[in-house]
């Protein structure tokens, strides 16, 4: 997949969005934020070598829980949602079940 250079302030995805692309951060930093009761909460930082944006597709959620915003100039590899879906579908059903049903895992991601 091609790498894209992203400038500070670029929004990769928005809370409530229904797109499901994932992202690999090669260089730089992205912050995840969430609007709760009218105020924005942030503090989850994703840096080089880390992935983000895959939980919406992995857990078959209707919408994204966070907004992902580039915090410093970054090189990022976007992974299309359909590629993620295809890879998940080709995975061992037991592993898929374990990940999707990990006790309270989804709650910890959004809580």
Residues covered by each model-derived region:
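A small-molecule sensor/coupling module
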Residues: 63-66, 82-111
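Short, flexible helix/strand-to-coil boundary loops that buttress conserved ligand/catalytic motifs
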Residues: 34-36, 56, 80, 88-91
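Cyclic nucleotide-binding regulatory domains
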Residues: 10-72
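Glycine-rich, flexible loop/turn motifs
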Residues: 2, 39-42, 54, 84, ...
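Short proline/glycine- and basic residue-enriched helix-capping loop/turn segments at helix->loop/beta transitions
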Residues: 1-10
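A short hydrophobic beta-strand segment most commonly corresponding to one strand
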Residues: 74-83
